[in-house]
């Protein structure tokens, strides 16, 4: 299997983002976004997904973090789509349950070529380390729309909002790792009865 890494840049009047992902990495992470708690969460994705991430972002944080968080999700999703390529020989589906003390989250995903997000997390407070918890949805929506995956996120229980968020991102990393893992039994075959996992919206 060829090298599965990609770099994407996104420049708008609101943000300037550069994201690099290596799907066959070792969990290395270099982040410079101006958003410490989001960086803490992305570090969990890298370490638990065994992907290397290098993300640099400048945005209109003097307004709020919405544009920057959403655009990081978009740019990382685009890089992921480029890195994973035609998806031949991968497992396609990934899932993970991750606990952290009282919190438990489940993430299930499909490299379907059809973007879809179902996220059910009732955070116990509105801000974690100064980060608006509503923006987690914006990050994942941006990622899903451009990675072209179906993603289900459920926080099954939790009292501490930090623990809720951390279990979600750890489970996301582990589910990604499972989905993109090469399956030796597939031997370069696309894991779909249609023979393609394209962006046409009808892959099964």
UniProtKB/Swiss-Prot annotation:
Pathway: Amino-acid biosynthesis; L-histidine biosynthesis; L-histidine from 5-phospho-alpha-D-ribose 1-diphosphate: step 6/9. It catalyses: D-erythro-1-(imidazol-4-yl)glycerol 3-phosphate = 3-(imidazol-4-yl)-2-oxopropyl phosphate + H2O. InterPro entries: IGPD_sf, ImidazoleglycerolP_deHydtase, ImidazoleglycerP_deHydtase_CS, Ribosomal_Su5_D2-typ_SF. CDD domains: IGPD (cd07914). PROSITE patterns: IGP_DEHYDRATASE_1 (PS00954), IGP_DEHYDRATASE_2 (PS00955). Its EC number is 4.2.1.19. One of its GO terms (biological process) is L-histidine biosynthetic process. It is found in: Cytoplasm. Residues 183-204 are annotated as: Disordered. The keyword Lyase applies. It holds the Pfam family IGPD. One of its GO terms (cellular component) is cytoplasm. GO terms for molecular function: imidazoleglycerol-phosphate dehydratase activity. Keywords: Amino-acid biosynthesis, Cytoplasm, Histidine biosynthesis, Lyase. It is an enzyme of class 4 (lyase). Residues 190-204 have a biased composition (Polar residues). The keyword Cytoplasm applies. Belongs to the imidazoleglycerol-phosphate dehydratase family. This is Imidazoleglycerol-phosphate dehydratase.
């Amino acid at each position: 299997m060829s090298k599965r890494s990609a770099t994407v840049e996104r420049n708008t009047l609101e943000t300037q983002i550069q994201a690099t992902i290596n799907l066959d990495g070792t969990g290395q992470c270099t982040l410079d976004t101006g958003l410490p708690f989001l960086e803490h969460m992305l570090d969990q994705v890298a370490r638990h997904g065994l992907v290397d991430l290098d993300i640099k972002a400048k945005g209109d944080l003097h307004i709020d973090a919405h544009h920057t968080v959403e655009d990081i999700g978009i740019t990382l999703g685009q890089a992921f789509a480029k890195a994973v390529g035609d998806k031949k020989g991968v497992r396609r589906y990934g899932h993970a349950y991750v606990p952290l003390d009282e919190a438990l989250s489940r993430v299930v995903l499909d490299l379907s070529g059809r973007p879809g997000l179902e996220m059910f997390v009732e955070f116990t407070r509105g801000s974690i380390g100064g980060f608006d918890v509503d923006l987690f949805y914006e990050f994942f929506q941006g990622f899903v729309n451009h990675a072209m995956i179906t993603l289900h996120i459920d926080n099954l229980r939790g009292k501490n909002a930090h623990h809720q968020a951390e279990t979600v991102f750890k489970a996301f990393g582990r589910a990604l790792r499972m989905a993109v893992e090469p399956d030796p039994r597939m031997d370069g075959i696309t894991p779909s009865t249609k023979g393609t996992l394209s962006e046409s919206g009808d892959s099964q």
